[in-house]
């Protein structure tokens, strides 16, 4: 049995299946884990979700994913709280025969996946530097509970698009909308933050070097990586294609290599401890 952790798919079905073939994937033995953003902008979101949901139905213990910002955007569009953009290529999903299955799949998908035996944690954007893995799990469990409640789901999706609060405060209550919003932002939108651990959204078009001139740094420069090392955990994340999967922090692995932007799809072979990034790019004509 092998464990493979995939970077953002974004509906790049052909590259995904080509990479599965490249690693000699055996659905009866191997485990697949995804860093989120299974859909959004890519050419074949229906095929991508059909394959993943079918595999999960057959092998529920071997297929795992976390929610990404594009996955949550799809839920918000479905419920009428956000307008679909043509570039996101969601219309084919919204008109698909299995639409309700996709909605239930994403509503049951957590923000964080942790395997204590394999000593791994997977989150779309990462884990807020102030939190340990146990604390992060507690916070994400709150959102999983929210998404199981029809009314709370609508409240969250209707109000999640805001840049505040931009930092965590211990007095935030589990029933507080600001608390919900911060959890979602930290796990699905986070890239940069200040030394005071204030999340930054104003440097999204800057390089890391440019942001550092304004004393803004990658989230993984702070705090919790040392906690992961102490616990012998490794954290895997996607979301940040501009990094090209370059992260120099021990016990933190970046996996988004920008397949949907014309680059390649990557995965990490856990048992071999190696990143697999063959240049498989399917050209559509």
Per-segment meaning from a language model:
Residues 42, 46-49, 54-174:
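Active-site neighborhood of divalent metal-dependent phosphoester bond hydrolases
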Residues 17-20, 46-47, 77-79, 134-135, ...:
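Short amphipathic alpha-helical segments
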Residues 10-14, 40-42, 70-76, 239-246, ...:
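Active-site environment of divalent metal-dependent phosphoester hydrolases
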Residues 27-30, 60-62, 122, 232:
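A general structural motif
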Residues 137-285:
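Acidic, His/Gly-rich catalytic cores of divalent-metal-dependent hydrolytic chemistry
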Residues 6-7, 32-36, 65-68, 123, ...:
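Active-site neighborhood of phospho(di)ester-bond hydrolases with catalytic His/Asp-centered motifs
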Residues 28-29, 83-88, 255-257:
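Short hydrophobic/aromatic-enriched beta-strand-loop microsegments
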Residues 1-57, 72:
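N-terminal active-site segment of His-dependent metallophosphoesterases
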